[in-house]
Amino acid sequence: MPITSKYSDEHVESILTEIAAVLNKHNASPELTLMVVGNIATNVINQNVAAAQRKVIAEKFAQALVSSLQS
C-alpha cells in the first residue's frame, strides 16, 4: 500500500535538488553525506519531538529508510 504524503513530489524534489547541490559544492563523499543527513535527522528529532517519543520516532524513521531501499 503506497504511503500518501501531505507534501507534493515537486516540493520534496526541489528541496532534494538544493541539498544535493550543496553537497556537490563541498565534494561530499557518500560517507560524509550520510553523516550530514544523520546529524540533520538527529537534530530535527531532538529539537522537535518530545523526549518520551524520540526513540519511537527514530525507530519508525529507521524502518521507513530500510523499507525504501532497493533490494
From Swiss-Prot:
Gene3D superfamilies: YejL-like (1.10.3390.10)
SUPFAM superfamilies (UniProt xref): YejL-like (SSF158651)
Any Pfam family hit: DUF1414
InterPro entries found in the cross-reference section: UPF0352, YejL_sf
Family as reported in the entry's similarity comment: Belongs to the UPF0352 family.
Name this protein carries in UniProt: UPF0352 protein VC_2040
Organism of this sequence: Vibrio cholerae serotype O1 (strain ATCC 39315 / El Tor Inaba N16961)
The organism's taxonomic lineage, starting at the top: Bacteria, Pseudomonadati, Pseudomonadota, Gammaproteobacteria, Vibrionales
